[in-house]
Amino acid sequence: MGERPELAAVLDMQPHPEGGWYRETWRSPVEFMTSGYDGTRAAATAIHFLLLPGERSAPHTVRSDELWLWHRGGPLLLNIDGAEIVLGPDVEHGQLLQAVVPGGVSQAARPAGDQYVLVSCVVSPGFDFADFRLD
C-alpha cells in the first residue's frame, strides 16, 4: 500500500489487512461471553473505512454481524456471499445507505466507480482480529 491519502491522514486511518484504510472510532465498554467465541467480546465496535479507486476489501469473513453505513464519495459495490449490492447516495435508483453482512458469511467490497468511498462498519458482537479471516 502506498503513501497515506489525505482523507486517511485527516481521519487518522491506518492500512487495513484486507485492503483500504481504517480507524476504530468506538468500542463498547460493555463486554460479555457468548457461545462460538473464544473469550469476551465488546457488545459492539465501529470503524471508519476508506477505499480509493482501484483498492478493494479482499474477500474475508467476520464471525459477527457487520453493518455497513455509506457516508460519502462514490458508490460501493458490496459482495455478500456472491450477491452484489450497491451502497451509495442514489437511493432513487436502488442504491442503499446501509446493508448488513451476517456473521460467518464471506464479503468483499470495492468502489463501483472512479471515486473514493467512505463508510462506517459496526460489528456486533464487537470486532476482534481473532474472529477475522481472509478467504
Task: Tell me what each language-model feature is.
Residues 1-99, 108-109, 114-116, 121-134:
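Non-catalytic, conserved peripheral segments adjacent to functional cores
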